[in-house]
A protein has these predicted regions:
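Active-site glycine-centered loops adjacent to acidic/histidine catalytic or metal-binding residues
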Residues: 74, 103, 125, 188, ...
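AMP-binding/adenylate-forming catalytic core of the ANL superfamily
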Residues: 35-36, 43, 156, 161-162, ...
Length: 316
């Protein structure tokens, strides 16, 4: 199961006596027809759902003014995707902005949300009632000041008691701080602004260390997705003989667009002109699709495994 899908799309609405329309398996062709037939007031989904909506011509003439809430969660929503989705909603009659939340199954789904006045671009809002957030220096319990990036930690009544029969993993993520409370160390990087609004920037596990420099895949992905011909991008670390790892970008183009030398050069120049030298991808690969997990997230681990196998085969 997935905490976001159950908590936001099933449990929450049912507690409020709201009709819930269950879609057992997402079908891009049927989705526009379902939206037109049922006219839901709210939809919740992961970023790949918004990508599908943006690229689906079936939505060209559909009025979405019935929508009051569009909630994104389950995975990182890039700033460029957020901006594109907001334009899409307004051009289809929905005078709203996409809402974001943050949470994980270990904290029983959502722990923060972009309540009114906190839905700033790129933010994940403020803590939900009963929850507390702090930012710690990664791998420690040392709390950091406002504006400084570190590991997002959550404390509250919805945080799990632990992983069943996995004491070592439990001790690694549930840690007691100086305030005497037990905090969930999420493995995600972010910061809290002086006004209390929280920002998620990167999953700690996805960070690429290249020649001692920290390379953040989502920063590169967000930049490449700003190119008008790019639909989706995923960046992973690939083995390098002396830098240990370097970045490689996997790119999916929008419908009707094809890879060509001019486009490849434009994307390379975009990266060179806007990124630190150590963050610029060493390789670019264009694909028709990207692998997905069971929860429709981009499966970056599969891409990493593919690259690892390639490197190992070259060494033989």
């Amino acid at each position: 199961f997935h905490g976001f899908g159950l908590g936001v799309s099933v449990h929450g609405p049912l507690c409020l006596k709201v009709e819930t329309i269950l879609v057992p398996e997402f079908d891009g062709k049927r989705f526009p027809k379902m939206m037109k037939t049922y006219k839901p007031q709210a939809i919740a989904g992961v970023p790949t759902l918004w990508s599908a909506m943006l690229e689906n011509k079936g939505f060209d003439n559909i009025d979405l003014s019935n929508l009051k809430y569009v909630i994104s969660g389950g995975d990182y929503l890039t700033l460029s995707m957020e901006e594109r989705m907001n334009r899409f909603l307004r051009t289809h009659g929905a005078n709203i902005s996409i809402s974001k939340g943050y949470g994980m199954t270990e904290s029983t789904a959502a722990t923060s949300y972009t309540f009114s006045g906190t839905n700033e671009p790129g933010s994940i809002g403020i803590p939900m009632i009963g929850n507390k957030f702090c930012i710690c220096k990664p791998e420690t319990e040392e709390e950091l000041p406002f504006g400084e990036e570190g590991e997002i930690c959550v404390c509250g009544p919805t945080v799990m008691q632990g992983y069943l029969n996995r004491p070592e993993e439990t001790a690694n993520v549930l840690r007691k701080h100086k305030d005497g409370n037990t905090w969930l160390h999420t493995g995600d990087i972010g910061y809290i602004a002086p006004n209390g609004v929280i920002y998620f920037t990167q999953r700690l596990k996805r960070m690429i260390v290249s020649s001692g420099f920290n390379v953040y895949p989502n920063v590169i992905e967000e930049l490449i997705e700003k190119h008008p011909d790019v639909a989706k991008c995923c960046v992973v670390g690939i083995p390098h003989p002396y830098k240990v790892k370097v970045a490689k970008a996997f790119i999916v183009l929008k419908e009707g667009k094809e890879e060509n030398p001019k486009l490849r050069k434009e994307i390379k120049e975009l990266c060179k002109n806007n990124l630190e030298a150590f963050s610029v991808p060493r390789e670019y690969e264009f694909r028709d699709t990207l692998p997905k997990t069971l929860y429709s997230k981009v499966d970056y681990k599969q891409l990493e495994e593919e690259e690892k196998e390639k490197a190992e085969s070259k060494e033989k």
